[in-house]
Amino acid sequence: AAPAGSRAGEMDLTALLQNPLVENSNVHFNAKDVYNFQLEKTPDMRILMKKFKKSFDSAEPKPSTVTLDVGNTDRAFGTIIGSEITARFGNTLPDDAFIPKGLTLELVGDANDYIGKGLSGGKLVVYPPKDAAFDRSENIVIGNVALYGATGGTAFINGVAGERFCVRNSGATAVVEGVGDHGCEYMTGGTVVVLGKTGKNFAAGMSGGIAYVLDEDWDFYQRVNKDMVSLEPVEHKYDVSLLKDLIREHVELTGSPRGKEILDNFGEYLPKFKKVLP
């Protein structure tokens, strides 16, 4: 209770302490009125959970693969199966929005905002159909805020990402062929390779991790936020090896023509990369 005569005693907390059902209103709280998300209709429950049941029940799970069509209404695809893996095995599965270690999602096509949100150890691979007529390195294939809050794992994107790519990334490794505004914003860890142009305000609030950005037009300095980072050439043996290995894996997984061009002429492209370091 508030002391007598204090201003705190004059506060009315009724609105916080009571949850009245407002008549003729859709805004209310009732513990018994739980929203039905119809999870049983999701691809995770209809297909993935059934497909991998034997692996889940096995003392020594073996790798399994499933191919299926997903659409833009299949939200949070892979989240339920990822949760099941974490609940059953923790982080003990062999190497390979919340993809844990042991789960690989390979998407042929494009994706909406928030793909890879909370990536926590798994692998995410995105590329357009092999017969796509457009230049992958010049077209957006994933939406905004991809890999938001990722803590681990890898992502290889054969195309351009929207805004705020890898915002709050704290441990994931990603390769992409271009990003919109505010890339690597508030990043605290992990590694990002950008094989193309960035939007403005790159690395704003970036306090950890490393980014390697291809700066073919020598104008990246105009789009990076220099408040907390510095730009350096990629010269150290470790950086050169890491950069080349990530581009090579990107090409192997996505078939990226852009990545292959850079690998085939690595000596020519290396001086054009900038290392972004907090």
Language-model regions, residue ranges each:
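Long, distal/terminal scaffolding or interaction modules
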Residues: G5-L277
